[in-house]
């Protein structure tokens, strides 16, 4: 596990982001010796609440230079946002494919429901939104791979992809009607899972605040 810890008191730091250091901690050694992990039951992945008390970490476990941890972390966060965007795009495409296939197969009043524009248009719109988000994701990845600043692109890609995936999930469930709530179809499960990405690892509101301040030059809101 990687911990971001303050190694210089805030009052002595030139900026709030200074004086933070990354430490590599082996949980196999630390559990019960300074770290207590309490599981939090949820539907997506394994999550724990950590309590850290008098944990000792050897200096050789420091990642990078002391006091420069936040700078190292921020670079990885941009990659994480692009990664989450890619995951949301994959989810969105899954919802679109499932909805389109069902709309072709489901016959009501002797015609497939996909012949109706009221069914077609939401599927087409979800497809457009997902593919548009993918273009922004590629823009973020291209800049990251080139070593160029990509904070704006990575954040916007994550925001667009999370919204597109959620809208595609809602559309897919609506297309399936009552069957969308049947566990065998996996739609209701994936709908609940994809909603996570408007909350974590960074919320949509924080992304909007970042774009407003750092891209558009608006006053800092918090």
List where the protein language model places each region.
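A short core secondary-structure module
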Residues: 1-34
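Short, solvent-exposed loop/turn segments at the edges of secondary structure
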Residues: 17-18, 45-47, 192
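Short, structured patches in soluble enzyme cores that scaffold and shape functional sites
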Residues: 4-7, 24-27, 41, 54, ...
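Cytochrome P450 core scaffold surrounding the K-helix E-X-X-R motif
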Residues: 61-66
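Alpha-helical interface subdomain recognition
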Residues: 49-51, 55, 68, 72-222
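Flexible, small-/acidic-enriched active-site or ligand-binding loops
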Residues: 27-56
């Amino acid at each position: 596990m990687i911990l971001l810890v303050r190694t210089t008191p805030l009052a002595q730091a030139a900026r709030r982001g200074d004086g933070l250091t990354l430490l590599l901690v082996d949980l196999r050694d630390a559990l019960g010796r300074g770290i207590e992990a309490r599981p939090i039951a949820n539907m997506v992945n394994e999550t724990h609440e950590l309590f850290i008390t008098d944990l000792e970490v050897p200096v050789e476990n420091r990642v990078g230079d002391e006091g420069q941890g936040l700078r190292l972390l921020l670079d990885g966060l941009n990659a994480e946002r692009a990664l989450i965007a890619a995951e949301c795009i994959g989810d969105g495409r899954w919802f679109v494919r499932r909805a389109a296939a069902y709309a072709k197969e489901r016959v009501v009043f002797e015609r497939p429901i996909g012949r109706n524009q009221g069914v077609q248009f939401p599927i087409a719109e979800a497809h457009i939104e997902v593919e548009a988000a993918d273009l922004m994701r590629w823009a973020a990845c291209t800049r990251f791979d080139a070593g160029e600043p990509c904070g704006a692109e990575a954040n916007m890609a994550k925001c667009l992809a999370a919204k597109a995936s959620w809208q595609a999930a809602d559309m897919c469930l609506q297309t399936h009607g009552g069957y969308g709530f049947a566990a065998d179809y996996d739609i209701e499960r994936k709908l609940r899972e994809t909603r996570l990405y408007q909350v974590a690892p960074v919320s949509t509101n924080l992304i909007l605040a970042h774009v407003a301040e750092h891209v558009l030059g608006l006053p800092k809101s918090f």
